[in-house]
Amino acid sequence: MDKRLDKKYTKEWFILLGLLLGVTVTNGFARFAYGLLLPAMQAEMDWNYAQAGWLSTVNALGYIVGAISTMFLVQKFASEKLFAFGLITTSVVLLMTGVLPTLEAQYALRFFAGTFGAVSFSTAGAIASGLFKENARLNALSIAILFGTGGGFGIILAGAFIPTLIDVVGNSAWPICWIIIGLLSIVFMPFGIWSALQIESSKPSRLTRNEFRLLKMLPELAGYACFGFGYIVYLTFLSAWMTGQSIDATMITTIWVILGLCICISPFLWRPIFARFGNGIPLAMVLSSIAFGSVVPLLSPAFSILILSAVIFGSSVFMAPGAITNFTRKNLPQEMWAYSISIFTVLFAISQTLGPYVAGLIGDYFDNIGMGLVTAFIILLLGALVSLSQKELSKN
């Protein structure tokens, strides 16, 4: 009988499904649904650009706080417990986002969404790395599915109903959208918690300076920081461009669903690469693909070009977390996985905070938002080149 079909593997696939739904909440909903709802929130609540911009900033700051906290928490608590805690708290925060509409409450909720989401997202990869230990190909596929399909599924769900509901009801529907997202999160939450409880409890990380070879991982770390800087510029541009072009709800839904679908199928495209390489090549290839997907819109403002861009970008963007998780699993002992991924997440959180700001300054200087995309393109390619120099490490 095919090992994929025996009882042991069947249970592991269900565990992966639960983890995937957790990532749908903490990544797909908590981070990317906000981009769809911000224009309606800003118009209905009469926020200026500075107020709306600070909502993104406090969310990014919360993500930094959560990522840094996870670095220390994984040395005291098992990854499974931290994942469940982050999933529960993020689900509650998303529901409350639709209940408390004041600007002050939104600042606090966006901060906590970033903080709790980072805790759960950072530990999800470490948990998934322990699945299918006897089968390198299935292990690589499970890591890719976790980040790709998990985040992509959230984008598909949010993109399928938010633009249409806003178009039919009006901007005043934004709290309803958040409540729907919150309720979906609460529905998904038990599956994620169940999956975490099925995993054999991992030992908290116990590290010394000599055990964690940070300097030998610098190319991979630098490449991932470049990913954080570059990818967020594109997503910021995508929302702004479609809003500025007065694209109707059907076309906006089409773009987001295509983007989400490509993210969902991306694990199957990248699985052979993850299974084959334990060095910096997977991250370098992912960053190169994201870079070219980001710059495609500059070729033409045509809607078809934007679709092409979404396909290229969506097929690779969520594979960067998968690439660094795959690198961690293949190069470090299991007790170091969560700590390693949390360090990657801290760098990512900081760089994604700086990305839109720097790109915005460049766009303002040239009076052309396209120059921000060019900047992201250059940074992503630079990250790809640096990642290529990353060699495999010895686990011993």
Where are these predicted regions, by residue range?
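Conserved MFS/SLC helix-loop-helix module at the cytosolic interface between two early adjacent transmembrane helices
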Residues: 65-102
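Cytoplasmic helix-loop-helix junction between adjacent transmembrane helices
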Residues: 109-149
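Helix-to-loop junctions at the C-terminal end of transmembrane segments
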Residues: 66-78, 266-278, 363-364
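Paired small-residue
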Residues: 93, 104-113, 304-312
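A late C-terminal transmembrane helix in Major Facilitator Superfamily
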Residues: 329-368, 376
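C-terminal transmembrane helical hairpin of 12-TM major facilitator-type secondary transporters
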Residues: 278-327
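Helix-loop-helix hairpin linking two adjacent transmembrane segments in secondary transporters
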Residues: 102-105, 138-196
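Extracytoplasmic gate region of multi-pass secondary transporters
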Residues: 34-35, 216-257, 263-264
